[in-house]
Design a protein with these regions (language model features):
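C-terminal accessory helical subdomains adjacent to catalytic cores in phosphodiester-
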Residues: 2, 19-37, 51-161
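N-terminal beta1-alpha1 ligand-phosphate binding loop
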Residues: 2-19
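N-terminal polybasic phosphate/anion-binding patch
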Residues: 35-45
Length: 161
């Protein structure tokens, strides 16, 4: 059975990213047996051509076990990482590594972020979808509390869920 490989941040077993992707696959009534997850660890691993998962994927493509790749990666914030942070930097770096690996004909990219700011991560995307009244409440709390965590969206979402 030819499979689709989904490459995402974190580990392959259980992260917010792959749990959400599994729910989406289920909701769309797609065959989950045809999907294999590759947890790439930290974001910078995506941009290392020697990363071990890439060798496994390349072998699986050559053996016709995998015929499609989906790269799911956080945009993060440009002010935190001038090289890979922000939507445009992430997209450029990811397209470069995909071309270097020879995966361009087999790949799609989804950069996870707040669609309005094009920055952030999975939690930013989820929080961007909540009603404005709730979003304002969260922003007011952050302002009043002077809560300055680098991962505000992650912290908030983990408390809400």
């Amino acid at each position: 059975m030819v499979k689709v490989a989904i490459l995402h941040e974190g580990n392959a077993k259980k992260t917010n990213d792959n749990e959400l992707l599994k729910l989406l696959i289920q909701e769309l009534e797609l065959d989950s047996e045809r999907v294999v997850f590759f947890g790439m660890g930290v974001k910078s691993n995506f941009f290392k051509p020697e990363y071990p998962s890439y060798k496994n994927i390349k072998n699986s493509i050559e053996n016709e076990e995998i015929n499609k790749l989906l790269f799911v990666i956080d945009a993060d914030y440009e002010h935190n990482d001038q090289k890979y942070g922000g939507y445009q930097n992430t997209e450029k770096a990811l397209k470069n590594i995909i071309a270097e690996l020879g995966f361009q004909n087999d790949s799609d990219i989804y950069i996870v972020c707040d669609p309005k700011t094009q920055e952030g991560y999975l939690e930013s995307l989820i929080l961007s979808s909540i009603p404005l009244q709730h979003k304002n409440c969260i922003q007011d709390f952050l302002y009043c509390s002077e809560f300055k965590s680098k991962d505000n969206h992650k912290s908030i979402l983990n408390q809400i869920l």
